[in-house]
C-alpha cells in the first residue's frame, strides 16, 4: 500500500480504539460520552469486598441481574466483553467451580481446533469478546489497581453518534510548517 493508505489506516485504527475506550470508559465530560462503566443505574455484581477470582456463581449472578431488568432487547447480541487477563482466568474455569479437575470447561474456544473457524468463543452459552479497553487496573477494597471488569449485555443497544462521511484527513498548510520541515495531519471520524 501507498503511504497515504498507511497513514489513513493508522489514523482509522487509532480513532476506532478511542471510540471503543469512550464507549466503555468515557467520562461524560470534555466532549466524551458517558461510557458503560460510568453509567449509573446499570447492574453490577461484585466478586468480593476486595475483589476475587471469577466463579460460575458470579457469572450466573451477572447474567441474572441483567436479564431480570429486560437487558436483552436482541438476545442474539448478548455478549461478554472483558480483557485478556480475565480471558485467561475464564479459560481455566470449570463447571465444578474450580480451575483444576472439576467438570467441563465453561469457556469454549475450540475455534475448530485453532483453525480459527467454526465455533465462536462462548462462556456459559454467550459469546465472549476480548478487548484491552476493558480495565484491568481497577481498585476494590484493599486490592488496589489489580482488579478487572467483565461487561455483559446486549451490545446492539450501545449507540454512539458520529457525523460526517467517514474519516476526514486535513493536512496542515501553515507556511511555518514548511519552513520547519513539519507536516501536521488531523483525522476526524
Model-derived features: where do they sit?
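Structured, hydrophobic secondary-structure cores that serve as assembly/anchoring elements
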Residues: 1-189
